[in-house]
Amino acid sequence: MKLIVGLGNPGTKFVNTRHNVGFAVVDSFLSQNKYQILKEDKTDHIYQINFNHHQSLLIKPQTYMNLSGEVVKKIINKYRIKIENILVIVDDIYLDEGKLKLKMQGGHGGHNGLRNIIDRLGTKQFKRLKIGVSLDSCMPLDQYLLTPVNASSQKNILKNINIINKIIFNFIQDVDFNILMNGYNSKL
């Protein structure tokens, strides 16, 4: 079983913020596929999807970004998901808006959601799909990430949403992650 984790913050005031790109991606993927709601409550939203006998879970932790690892750990323990079968979708201020980067593993890069996942799982060995949100040096970082973006920026950040959905589909279908990285990192 695969686990796709879209990082973000719960609540309508965060919907169109840079920090909620992970939630937006999960929502986009679900809107294009048949899925089953397993749970939607104050701690997590869990969705199940099946493609050709490949069962996967997509989740949106509802504990706020900085506590995402609590939910991820609970789910991997409950469903016995291996670390190598986890893909975390996360915003990245060091990438230009809309730029994508797949990583096999790595540190948190200052991202508190990733930091909490690493801390709770005790490993950096999970896969990531980073989506560029750029950085505005004129604004405090938390304000920049948590302020709703205009329609133009939102469109630019998610300009590769069809490619992102293909990456998720291929990940679920067990396409080798090195092939995905080689195929998509060089193009995007």
Curated annotation (Swiss-Prot):
Monomer. One of its GO terms (biological process) is protein quality control for misfolded or incompletely synthesized proteins. It comes from the Bacteria. The keyword DNA-binding does not apply. InterPro entries: Pept_tRNA_hydro (IPR001328), Pept_tRNA_hydro_CS (IPR018171), Pept_tRNA_hydro_sf (IPR036416). This is Peptidyl-tRNA hydrolase. The record marks N9 as: Discriminates between blocked and unblocked aminoacyl-tRNA. Its EC number is 3.1.1.29. It is found in: Cytoplasm. Keywords: Cytoplasm, Hydrolase, RNA-binding, tRNA-binding. TRNA binds at F14, Y64, N66, N112. It is an enzyme of class 3 (hydrolase). It holds the Pfam family Pept_tRNA_hydro. SUPFAM superfamilies: Peptidyl-tRNA hydrolase-like. The record marks D91 as: Stabilizes the basic form of H active site to accept a proton. The active site is at H19 (proton acceptor). Hydrolyzes ribosome-free peptidyl-tRNAs (with 1 or more amino acids incorporated), which drop off the ribosome during protein synthesis, or as a result of ribosome stalling. Catalyzes the release of premature peptidyl moieties from peptidyl-tRNA molecules trapped in stalled 50S ribosomal subunits, and thus maintains levels of free tRNAs and 50S ribosomes. The gene is pth. It comes from Onion yellows phytoplasma (strain OY-M). Signal peptide: none annotated. One of its GO terms (molecular function) is tRNA binding. It catalyses: an N-acyl-L-alpha-aminoacyl-tRNA + H2O = an N-acyl-L-amino acid + a tRNA + H(+). Belongs to the PTH family. Its main location: cytoplasm.
